[in-house]
Regions:
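Short, acidic, small-residue-rich periplasmic hinge/interaction motif at the N-terminus
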Residues: 28-33, 38-43, 72-81, 90-138, ...
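N-terminal periplasmic "start-of-domain" segments of outer-membrane beta-barrel proteins
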Residues: 43, 47-56, 112-140, 166-170, ...
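Outer-membrane beta-barrel proteins
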Residues: 135, 199-201, 207-208, 215-258, ...
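Extracytoplasmic beta-strand/coil segments of soluble accessory domains associated
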Residues: 60, 146-202, 229-230, 240-259
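Residues embedded in well-ordered regular secondary structure
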Residues: 152, 164-169, 179-185, 194-220, ...
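Short, polar/charged loop or turn motifs at beta-strand boundaries
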Residues: 27-30, 128-151, 159-163, 171-178, ...
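Extracellular/periplasmic, surface-exposed regions of secreted and cell-surface proteins
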Residues: 184, 398, 404-413, 418-423, ...
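Periplasmic N-terminal soluble interaction domains immediately after the signal peptide in Gram-negative
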Residues: 46-47, 52-110, 244-246, 256-258
Length: 761
C-alpha cells in the first residue's frame, strides 16, 4: 500500500529566557523534544553554554568581542550529529538561533538496556542487542506499535497478518526458535512482562478459525508508540537467559517516557495523518461472461461463457412471468427477472472492486504534559487513534491514557510508578477461504454480474421471501443459501466486533542501602478484558445460513514481582565487579467464555435473541488456565583493565507446568582491542557469548486430568455417560510427569568495529 503522511508538531514552552547582548535558542531532536546538556560554542572562542533540561541555552557575548560580526555557532550532543549555523551578532540586544539535531545512529548504540531494565555500555557486552529510539519509530508513520519496529533492527522480522486496521503482527527475532510453541518474543514494558498473544477463542472458531474467520489483534498494539522512550531488542540467548522459559524467542525491552525535572511545565500536541491505498489490484478477466463452453449460463460458478464483446448489446431478454428479485424503492428500485438471453455488454469488475475497497485513513492525536523538579517528575499523555481500513466498514479506534510519576522521598529512597490504560474497539471483515468471507465471493464473481442490490425480496408464485441474499450464484435470491457471500453482504450485514479494556502498571522502589549498594523492588500488573461479537444474519452462506450470533469474553491477568540487589565492588583501578541477585514471582491467569445461538426463526438484524427462538438451543463452553513461575537469578559482571569484560549469569526456575526445577546458564565476554589496531579503525571488539533459554510446556501437561462428555463405544451401540446423568473420569490423554521444557542452546561470536572516528560501523 502507498502511504501519504502529513505530520504537525506544535510544542508549547513556558518560561522562556529573555537576555540582552546574547544569543539564545533551543536545541531539540527532529521530533521537537528538548536535548538537555548540548554544548553550544562560538567557533574559535571559549564562549559558550550548555542547554538546560528544556533544551534552552543562552550565551552572553563579552563586551568588545564579536558584536556586529557574523560568527559560527557549533552545537554538539552525544548520540546526535554535530551542527553549525552562521549568526549575526547585534551591537546590542539578543538574537535567537534554534537547532534541530539529527540522530547519529552509531553514537546512540553506546548505551543499551539489559534484560532486567538496567542501562549498560554496549561496548562492554559480549551479547547481541539492538536499540531503537522513539524518533525512528514515530517517523515510520505506522499506526500500530508492532509495525513501527519493521526495518529498525537486523534479524527482526515483522509481518502484518492482514490489511485489516489493527490486525495482528508477527514479530520474529532470528527466525523460528521453537517446534512446539509460539515464535513471538517476550515483551517487557518498564520491567513488567506483558501479554502479546493473538487469541482466537471459541467464537472465532465458530466463524472459521485462523484461515476462515476474522483476524485478531496483537496485544503489543495496545501500546501507544508515542509514549515510548526507547526499545531494546535482546537477540541472543545469553542476553535473555535471565527470563528463563519465556525467552527462547528473544526479548523486547520497552521503556516509556519520564517527566522533566526542570521545574517548568511542558505541553506538546502532535497530529499525524496517513492515507492507505491499494498498490496493485489482482488482474481479473472481463472477456468471457458467466457460463461454460462458450455459452452463457446464469448462476453457475464458472466464467467461461460467451465472449462479452460479441453480444448484440442492449437489454437482456427476460421472462417477467417467472420468479423475480426486487430491492430498493423509488429511484433506487431494482428488479431482476429470469434471464432468457444475455445481450448486455456491460462488465462490472472495477465497479464491484470499488464497492468493497476504499482509500483507508488514520488520524492520531497525541497530547502530553510533563514537568517536575529535583524531587519529583510527572508525565501525563492522551493518545486518540481513529483508523478506517481499505475495506469499507472496517475500522480500529484506540484511546490511550498514561500517567508516569517519580518521587525522590529521600537521599536513599526513590519511588517510580508508570501506568497506561487502553480502550480499543474494532470491526474486522471475514476473510480467507470462507464461504461467508470477503475475497472468495468477490474474486469468483463473474465479470458481467453487478454485485450491487445484494439484499431484497424474492417473489415466486405471489409469495414474497424478504431479506434474501443475492449473489452471482443465486442471482434471483431464489434459495436461502447463496452458496458464496456477495462481498457487499459480507461488509455491510455481517459483524465481527471487539472491544478491549487494558491496564498495564509497574511500580518500582529503589533503596540505596549504602554507597555502591542498591535494592530494587518491582511490582506490576497487566490485565485486559476482550469482548467479541460475531453476527451472521439469516441468509449468510454456508453453515451460517440460518443465522449465527456468537460471543467471546476473554480475560487475561498477569502479576509480576521482582526483588533485586545490586552491589558494586572496586578492587583496584584495573579490576571492578558488579554483583546482582534477584528473585521473581509471576502469576498468569486466562479465561474464556464462549456462547453461541443459531437457527433464528425470524430474519432480524438485531444482535439480541432469545435462546428459545431457535431450532437449536444456545451452546456454551469455557476454558481456564492458571500458570505460576518463580525464578532466582544472578549476574556477575567483571571489568578488568577496562578492556576485558566478563558477564556470568543464570536463572533457576520453578514452573507450575513442569514437575521440577530447571537452570538456564549464560555467559558472555568482550575484549576491546582498540589500542592495538591502526587507523582508520577507531574501535574494535571481539565478543563471545553462550546461553540457554527455554519454552515451557502447555499448562497441566504433566498431570492426568478429568474429562466429561465421553462415550465408551463409538459403534452402533454407543454407551454415553450423558445417558446416566453425567460424570467424570481420568482423561485418556495421560499426563507426562517427566515432561521437560524445550531448551535452546546458543553460541555466538563476532567482531564489532568502527572506523573513521565512529562514522562507519
Amino acid at each position: 500500500m502507498n502511504k501519504l503522511r502529513n505530520s504537525l508538531i506544535i510544542p508549547i514552552f513556558f518560561g522562556l529566557i529573555n537576555a540582552q547582548s546574547s544569543v539564545q535558542g533551543t536545541v531539540t531532536d527532529q521530533n521537537g523534544d528538548p536535548l538537555a546538556g548540548a554544548n553550544v560554542v562560538v567557533n574559535g572562542t571559549s564562549v559558550g553554554a550548555a542547554s538546560d533540561s528544556e533544551g534552552l541555552y543562552q550565551i552572553a557575548i563579552p563586551t568588545g568581542t564579536v558584536e556586529g560580526q557574523t560568527v559560527t555557532l557549533d552545537v554538539s550532543y552525544i548520540g546526535f550529529k554535530s551542527q553549525s549555523a552562521s549568526v549575526d551578532i547585534p551591537l546590542s540586544g539578543s538574537v535567537t538561533q534554534n537547532f534541530s539535531l539529527e540522530v547519529d545512529a552509531i553514537g546512540l548504540q553506546a548505551i543499551s538496556v539489559t534484560a532486567l531494565g538496567f542501562e549498560a555500555n554496549r561496548d562492554k557486552q559480549g551479547s547481541t542487542s539492538s536499540s531503537i529510539n522513539s524518533g525512528d519509530m514515530n517517523r515510520s508513520g505506522e499506526s500500530l506499535m508492532a509495525n513501527s519496529l519493521a526495518g529498525k533492527a537486523s534479524n527482526v522480522i515483522v509481518n502484518p497478518s492482514a490489511g485489516d486496521p489493527g490486525a495482528s503482527t508477527s514479530i520474529k527475532i532470528r527466525g523460528a526458535n521453537t517446534i512446539s510453541g509460539a515464535n513471538q518474543p517476550l515483551i517487557v514494558v518498564d520491567g513488567m512482562p506483558i501479554n502479546n498473544s493473538t487469541t482466537y477463542g471459541g467464537g472465532n472458531n465458530i466463524t472459521g478459525g485462523r484461515t476462515g474467520g476474522s483476524t485478531q489483534q496483537s496485544r503489543i498494539n495496545d501500546i501507544n508508540a508515542n509514549d515510548i522512550a526507547s526499545v531494546e531488542v535482546l537477540k541472543g540467548a545469553s542476553a535473555a537467559a535471565l527470563w528463563g522459559s519465556k525467552a527462547a524467542n528473544g526479548v523486547i525491552v520497552i521503556k516509556t517516557k519520564d517527566g522533566s525535572s526542570s521545574g517548568k511545565m511542558k505541553m506538546t500536541y502532535k497530529r499525524t495523518e496517513s492515507f492507505d491505498q491499494i498498490h496493485e489490484q489482482i488482474p481479473m478477466q472481463d472477456t468471457y461472461g458467466q457460463g461454460r463452453d462458450g455459452s452463457f449460463r446464469a448462476g453457475i460458478h464458472e466464467s467461461w461463457g460467451d465472449k462479452i464483446s460479441e453480444r448484440t448489446g442492449g437489454a437482456d431478454v427476460v421472462d417477467t412471468s417467472r420468479p423475480y428479485f426486487v430491492s430498493g424503492e423509488g429511484e433506487n428500485s431494482f428488479t431482476q427477472y429470469t434471464i432468457v438471453e444475455k445481450n448486455s455488454k456491460d462488465t462490472f469488475v472495477q465497479d464491484n472492486f470499488d464497492a468493497v475497497f476504499q482509500t483507508g485513513r488514520f488520524a492520531q492525536d497525541d497530547f502530553q504534559v510533563s514537568g517536575g523538579d529535583a524531587t519529583k517528575t510527572y508525565l501525563f499523555s492522551y493518545g486518540r487513534l481513529r483508523q478506517n481500513g481499505i475495506v469499507r466498514n472496517s475500522f480500529y479506534d484506540r484511546d490511550n491514557f498514561r500517567l508516569n510519576t517519580k518521587f525522590k522521598l529521600s537521599d536513599k529512597i526513590t519511588m517510580t510508578s508508570k501506568a497506561g490504560y487502553t480502550y480499543s474497539n474494532a470491526n474486522r471483515i471475514q476473510q480467507s477461504s470462507n464461504t461467508a468471507g470477503l475475497l472468495i465471493g468477490l474474486l469468483r464473481t463473474s465479470p458481467d454480474f453487478d454485485n450491487s442490490h445484494y439484499k431484497g425480496t424474492y417473489v415466486s408464485g405471489g409469495v414474497e421471501y424478504r431479506g434474501r441474499h443475492r449473489s452471482y450464484r443465486k442471482y434471483l435470491g431464489q434459495t436461502l443459501n447463496p452458496t458464496y457471500n456477495n462481498p457487499l453482504w459480507t461488509i455491510n450485514e455481517q459483524k465481527s466486533t471487539t472491544g478491549v479494556n487494558r491496564l498495564i502498571m509497574s511500580n518500582e522502589m529503589n533503596y540505596k542501602l549504602r554507597e555502591g549498594t542498591d535494592i530494587v523492588a518491582r511490582a506490576g500488573i497487566d490485565t485486559y478484558t476482550d469482548n467479541r461479537d460475531w453476527f451472521f444474519p439469516v441468509g449468510s452462506a454456508g453453515s451460517r445460513v440460518n443465522g449465527v450470533f456468537a460471543q467471546d469474553v476473554i480475560t487475561n491477568k498477569e502479576t509480576n514481582y521482582d526483588l533485586i540487589g545490586r552491589h558494586n565492588l572496586k578492587f583496584s583501578d584495573d579490576l571492578s565487579m558488579v554483583a546482582t541477585l534477584g528473585y521473581n514471582w509471576n502469576d498468569r491467569g486466562y479465561s474464556r467464555t464462549s456462547t453461541r445461538i443459531d437457527s433464528f426463526l425470524v430474519n432480524t438484524s438485531k444482535q439480541t435473541v432469545n435462546v428459545n427462538t431457535g431450532a437449536r438451543f444456545s451452546t456454551a463452553d469455557n476454558a481456564r488456565i492458571f500458570i505460576r513461575s518463580t525464578r532466582t537469578y544472578g549476574v556477575l559482571s567483571i571489568d578488568a583493565l577496562d578492556q576485558i569484560f566478563l558477564n556470568l549469569s543464570g536463572a533457576l526456575e520453578d514452573h507450575s507446568s513442569i514437575s521440577k526445577s530447571y537452570f538456564y546458564p549464560a555467559m558472555d565476554v568482550a575484549v576491546q582491542l582498540t589500542n592495538y589496531v591502526p587507523a582508520p579503525f577507531s574501535f574494535l571488539k571481539a565478543r563471545f557469548a553462550y546461553g540457554q533459554v527455554g519454552v515451557r510446556p502447555s499448562a497441566h501437561r504433566f498431570q492426568t486430568l478429568a474429562e466429561s462428555g465421553f462415550s465408551y463405544s463409538s459403534y452402533s451401540d454407543p454407551l454415553s455417560i450423558s445417558d446416566w446423568g453425567g460424570g467424570y473420569r481420568l482423561d485418556d490423554d495421560q499426563g507426562n510427569k517427566d515432561i521437560k521444557p524445550e531448551v535452546k542452546t546458543e553460541t555466538e561470536f563476532g567482531l564489532d568495529f568502527r572506523m573513521f572516528d565512529d562514522r562507519f560501523a
